[in-house]
Amino acid sequence: PTIINGGVINSIQNTAKLGKSEWSILEADESDGSFVHIPPTYSIITNIDREHMDFYKSMDDLKNYFIQFIEKVPSFGKSFICIDDKINNDIVKKLKNQNFYTYGIHPNSNFLIKNIKHNKKFTEFDLMINLPNKKKEYIKKIKTPLLGIHNIRNSVAAVAVALTVGISIPEIKNGLLNFKGVQRRFNKIFSYNNIDFYDDYAHHPTEIKVVLEGVNKVYKGYDKVCIFQPHRISR
């Protein structure tokens, strides 16, 4: 597929790649509202936070942009919304178009994350799938080298889309297991004197909180130091 991403993808050492298939995968940028001009077939809404308020007039304005984006998805497509996020949960209730699935650790999720296990090398989880008018499905032992609950949620979003478009479970598991990640997304840079050094782009309070929660789960009992670089006065 053609790929356009906000960060450098480690496997291709670039933010973009021109593919040869009819598929395009891109990261939509909501910072200036331009994402509503993208015509998605499948969309993923990870979370919505009080950000980019230099452009949006209010939180209601921000929410309305996301509602507009979600409702642009055609009937032959689908939106995937993480309902662990409070604002996403509010938006779901306001959608006129019910053409979406939900995911997360929230018990009402269509793609429900179960049995999370953390270690330094991999995160493992199970996935219970409960879709309208379909038989329940349970996928065990999905592994990803990415750490933190936010990366599990992101992985599940990718799994949900992949299953919906007909990619097999073995292919999905293999793809996640071998995913090299994106630069500055909790990347391990090096180790020195038994100390591991990671780099992460998180600069919004919510993002920083989520990353640190992931670190605490993986490195229980270890001393941890966080060095924060302030970025933009609006954040």
Where are the regions that the model predicts?
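Acidic, Mg2+-coordinating active-site environments of NTP-dependent enzymes
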Residues: 11-13, 17-21, 40-197, 202, ...
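Active-site beta-alpha connecting loops in nucleotide-dependent enzymes
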Residues: 182, 206-235
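Loop/turn-to-beta-strand initiation segments
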Residues: 1, 22-23
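Conserved coil-to-alpha-helix start sites within the AMP-binding
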Residues: 29-38
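Short beta-strand-centered segment that lines the nucleotide-binding/catalytic pocket of NTP-utilizing
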Residues: 1-11
